[in-house]
Curated annotation (Swiss-Prot):
NCBIfam families according to UniProt: argH, PRK12308.1
Family: Belongs to the lyase 1 family. Argininosuccinate lyase subfamily.
Taxonomy of the source species: Bacteria, Pseudomonadati, Pseudomonadota, Gammaproteobacteria, Vibrionales
Gene (UniProt): argH
A molecular function GO annotation: argininosuccinate lyase activity
Organism listed in the record: Vibrio cholerae serotype O1 (strain ATCC 39315 / El Tor Inaba N16961)
Main location: cytoplasm
Organism domain of life: Bacteria
Cellular component terms (Gene Ontology): cytosol
Pfam families: ASL_C2, Lyase_1
Matching CDD domains: Argininosuccinate_lyase
Protein name: Argininosuccinate lyase
Annotated EC: 4.3.2.1
Biochemical pathway: Amino-acid biosynthesis; L-arginine biosynthesis; L-arginine from L-ornithine and carbamoyl phosphate: step 3/3
Length: 458
């Protein structure tokens, strides 16, 4: 059943109908469409379009339809309705007859779909916030188990300075907490009700839109009808939040993929998130992590596509906007799945502390400590930096670590170097000296972990 047939003398070409119809994807807005329709029916009572008895009859039928949809949303796809709004109205008329035809009074599909989409985004936001919080809790739990596990820190993917596995976990916690903050902000910004904006110029009925907004749980009604029906900022903002978070997930995945390699051997993932090779029986591939990394581009593509769609649209509604849903649905579904999968990768993870410590001791990651030692002896840092660089070259030439050079050899680079240098060059000293807020000293890491544990509980 089309909602607009009176103007036309010819039926739509079947190919156009297939091209134009959106039910195959906007059926996911069914619950929101029904909830919005219930609220609209109450508003129609206030302007004497519906009697109280009629509204109650409509609400009862809509609630029955809502229960049916919640039990089996896929049933909608068997219909030939143009979109979810048509389907709901058709089903309502089947239940209550001509009374169902009164529901759309004063309402356009333009403000209807804008409302549905915001309600859907709000509902999805709750699930995404929970998924982010769950991943944060998993990171903190793993971090708590590895406070004494030394890990090589990298710049340019070259060993740089030692850190700890806890510090590494908490670095990603910071990223996902920012994602949570961004999502919370975006959800607060979208929480305004377009319902009652009509097609573009507002509704002709003196409905109290603030009451209507409150009935649907919005903080307020939108202020401009032209903007309300054509605004898709919230779609792009949520996809942008998803894109940034997927970037963080991809970086996490890349780190962990590297850590699982035979060359690193820092961690081992559980069998439950890895796969094998059809040819090479020895393989254990980090497929879950690789898919997270791969799906990141998919979310970026959805955001870019949406921005290209709306970049030159005139006010107000245009059919181009029908393209907002598939990309949004896919982007948020993908983000949610990847958040869950990232958490799953931490279940049963094994950290090879002996190997991470061995790797942290290699690569002359204590060279900065020797430079700082010389600074303490009164040598300007830039000069100390050069002296240590020359010493590193000599150690490399001998195939030994800096701390394996004897005192006489070290004094060739600076006579100020004394026996007390050797305790300075240990891994323990390297960590201990990073004692400022946010550093890797055991005290600072313990403090950071304690704070993180408190945050993820709230």
């Amino acid at each position: 059943m089309a909602l607009w047939g009176g103007r036309f003398t010819q039926a739509a070409d079947s190919r156009f109908k297939s091209f134009n119809d959106s039910l195959r994807f906007d059926y996911r807005l069914a619950e929101q469409d029904i909830v919005g329709s219930i609220a609209w029916s109450k508003a129609l009572v206030s302007v004497n379009v519906l009697s109280v008895q009629e509204q109650q009859q409509l609400e009862q039928a809509l609630n029955h339809l809502l229960q049916s949809v919640q039990q089996d949303p896929e049933q909608i796809l068997a219909s030939d309705a143009e979109d979810i709004h048509s389907w709901v109205e058709q089903k309502l008329i089947e239940q209550v007859g001509d009374l169902g035809k009164k529901l759309h009074t004063g309402r356009s599909r333009n403000d209807q779909v804008a409302t549905d989409l915001k309600l859907w985004c709000r509902d999805q936001g709750v699930h995404l916030l929970l998924a982010l919080k769950t991943l944060q809790q998993q990171l903190v739990a793993v971090a708590a188990e590895h406070q004494s596990t030394v890990l090589p820190g990298y710049t340019h993917l070259q060993r740089a300075q030692p850190v700890t596995f806890t510090h590494w976990c908490l670095a990603y916690l910071e990223m996902f907490e920012r994602d949570e903050s961004r999502l919370t902000d975006a959800l607060a910004r979208l929480n305004t009700s377009p319902l009652g904006s009509g097609a573009l110029a507002g509704t002709a009925y003196a409905i109290d839109r603030e009451v209507l907004a409150a009935d649907l749980g919005f903080t307020r009604a939108t202020r401009n009808s032209l903007d309300a029906v054509s605004d898709r900022d919230h779609v792009m903002e949520l996809m942008s939040v998803a894109s940034i978070s997927m970037l963080h997930l991809s970086r996490l995945a890349e780190d962990m993929i590297f850590y699982t390699t035979g060359e690193a051997g820092f961690i081992e993932l559980a069998d439950t998130v890895t796969s094998g090779s059809s040819l090479m029986p020895q393989k254990k591939n980090p497929d879950a992590l690789e898919l997270i990394r791969g799906k990141t581009g998919r979310v970026y593509g959805a955001l870019a596509g949406m921005m290209m769609t709306v970049k030159a649209l005139p006010l107000a509604y245009n059919k181009d906007m029908q393209e907002d849903k598939e990309g949004l649905f896919d982007a948020l579904d993908t983000w949610f799945d990847c958040l869950q999968m990232a958490g799953l990768c931490f279940d049963g993870i094994k950290v090879n502390a002996a190997r991470t410590l061995e790797a942290a001791k290699q690569g002359y990651s204590n060279a900065t400590e020797l430079a700082d030692y010389l600074v303490a002896k009164g040598i300007p840092f830039r000069e100390a930096h050069h002296i240590v660089g020359v010493a590193v070259v000599a150690a490399i030439g001998k195939g030994v670590a800096l701390e394996e050079l004897c005192l006489a050899e070290l004094q060739q680079f600076s006579p100020l170097i004394e026996q007390d240098v050797y305790p300075i060059l240990t891994i323990e000293s390297c960590l201990e000296k990073r004692c400022a807020l946010g550093g890797v000293s055991p005290k600072q890491v313990a403090h950071a972990l304690q704070q993180a544990q408190a945050r993820v509980k709230s």
